[in-house]
Regions:
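Viral structural modules
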Residues: 1-214
Length: 214
């Protein structure tokens, strides 16, 4: 006779990457005064992620930062936000603990009679899924060897906001800041008693005007 027991466990699931194109045309910029587009920086993040049976509904925001020269040769910077929604299909169930990582794979700006900002998003949705595993716990009239196994179980996750500031001496007087782009790269993480620690590196690019030069 064999004895079985059902254990509650968790498993990590990553859906196939989904692509979403976001276009935005602001109406408050005078294109007749735009002489040259210098650069466009884009970042995006998911704000809401809701798991349903067979898919995840994600919503987020794209931030466009545009630097350009006006007809007088003066550099200027503008900042726009565009909201988006996307459906990502996968092996999801309602109630799964899901989250979405957003990567900008491509960006473009078209400046003709109107200004059109475009970003191509890659959405990677992950989830912690609850599962039941049936395991053999005992057997009669058999030679039995036992081995301890560890069953992964999801407990909790937490998001914290960590302020960061730094100062660099550029050797001159900054007339105006046209834009700032920052990227955070995780380097290391470790579990501790009652929490966790993470080591990160931040790369920041600032575009500014100094003595009339960008």
């Amino acid at each position: 006779m064999f004895d079985f027991e059902k254990l509650s466990a968790s498993k990590f699931y990553v859906a196939p990457t989904s692509e979403r194109v976001v276009e935005f045309s602001p109406s408050d910029i005078d294109m007749s005064n735009v002489a040259k587009v210098l650069s466009v920086a884009v970042d995006a993040r998911a704000i809401s992620v809701e798991a349903q049976d067979g898919y995840v509904q994600a919503g987020g925001r794209v931030n466009f930062r545009l630097a350009y020269l006006d007809k007088d040769g003066t550099p200027k910077g503008v900042d726009y936000n565009a909201d988006f929604t996307a459906r990502v299909d996968g092996e999801f169930e309602e109630g799964d603990n899901a989250w979405c990582d957003v990567v900008i794979s491509e960006s473009d700006v078209e400046a003709n009679d109107t200004l059109t900002l475009t970003a191509v998003l890659e959405l990677k949705v992950s989830a912690i899924k609850r599962d039941e595993i049936e395991v053999l716990t005992g057997a009669d009239d058999c030679y039995v060897t036992t081995k301890e196994i560890f069953v992964p179980t999801y407990i909790a996750q937490k998001t914290v906001v960590v302020p960061f500031d730094d100062e660099k001496n550029v050797g001159g007087e900054i007339e105006s800041v046209l834009g700032l782009s920052a990227t955070v790269v995780p380097l290391k993480s470790a579990a501790t008693e009652g929490g966790a620690t993470a080591k990160l590196k931040i790369y920041a690019i600032a575009t500014y005007v100094e003595s009339g030069q960008i």
